Amino acid sequence: MYIAVPAEILCLILPLLLGVAFLVLAERKVMAFVQRRKGPDVVGSFGLLQPLADGLKLILKEPISPSSANFFLFRMAPVATFMLSLVAWAVVPFDYGMVLSDLNIGLLYLFAISSLGVYGIIIAGWSSNSKYAFLGALRSAAQMVSYEVSIGLILITVLICVGSCNLSEIVMAQKQIWFGIPLFPVLVMFFISCLAETNRAPFDLPEAEAELVAGYNVEYSSMGFALFFLGEYANMILMSGLCTLLFLGGWLPILDLPISKKIPCSIWFSIKVLLFLFLYIWVRAAFPRYRYDQLMGLGRKVFLPLSLARVVPVSGVSVTFRWLP
């Protein structure tokens, strides 16, 4: 187990925050390309300084609290959401040994942290004392709980193949073949469940602008709004990293060639994460928002039985051919 020091934590958090900032810019650029627009291109060359301008604007805005809100909880909710999105990265390996804390229960740790994220949203909706914010928070809670069950069953499928909750061991078990190839339907279900877990389009019902104005963060401004925003995009990167570790071999090269081995393993990991982030943005640009009943029906009537049914054949094949680790 590696003991984290402040310098290592700083080297993890700063690139993550920069990645979140430029992920917002990349999303706006890709959305503009799909809609045949230019996107932001005024602030800096090709709009590269747009995230800095947006951040300064949010910092300089006045933080306004509703008169009927619970002030302490109203202020703490975005901080809790943002902090949970950061502490989850403690167990994510970027290369073999390049991890803050190589826990044997790293996968369970990530699952638990992602489950706790809903509390910040619930507290934000309740403490705002606004009907629209509270309805958005209730939607988010129901949505995340519904899809966490299928995510848990998918994780069990991977655990049967590996026999360990250590993320580094899960990656090293994919040296011969990535789990995304034999378990491709599971990968698709897991990615769609991650879309719902992070409240991203087409499952962004908790913040439906047409119905709930902006959802649980309708009363937030200034840094409160910015922290929710940063937390959402940090969770996007986290879930993309988890998809990479579980199904695309993590930091392992795409092809076992001499030239591919010269590229640092952390670069391979970043390339695969960027692939999933592009899918996040492309799905938002291509698909309309689901109705609430369609969203819950997909999670409970389709993904839950399918993910449960997938555990049975994987277990049977592993026991029959003595492939259990």
Curated annotation (Swiss-Prot):
GO function terms (MF aspect): NADH dehydrogenase (ubiquinone) activity
A cellular component term, taken from the record's GO annotations: mitochondrial inner membrane
Primary location group: mitochondrion
Catalytic activity: a ubiquinone + NADH + 5 H(+)(in) = a ubiquinol + NAD(+) + 4 H(+)(out)
SS bond list: none
EC number: 7.1.1.2
Coiled coil: none
Pfam families, per the entry: NADHdh
Transmembrane segments: 5-25, 40-60, 79-99, 105-125, 151-171, 177-197, 237-257, 263-283
Domain of life assignment: Eukaryota
Keyword field: Electron transport, Membrane, Mitochondrion, Mitochondrion inner membrane, NAD, Respiratory chain, Translocase, Transmembrane, Transmembrane helix, Transport, Ubiquinone
Membrane topology classification: Multi-pass membrane protein
Its biological purpose: Core subunit of the mitochondrial membrane respiratory chain NADH dehydrogenase (Complex I) that is believed to belong to the minimal assembly required for catalysis. Complex I functions in the transfer of electrons from NADH to the respiratory chain. The immediate electron acceptor for the enzyme is believed to be ubiquinone.
Family classification: Belongs to the complex I subunit 1 family.
Protein name stated in the entry: NADH-ubiquinone oxidoreductase chain 1
Gene: ND1
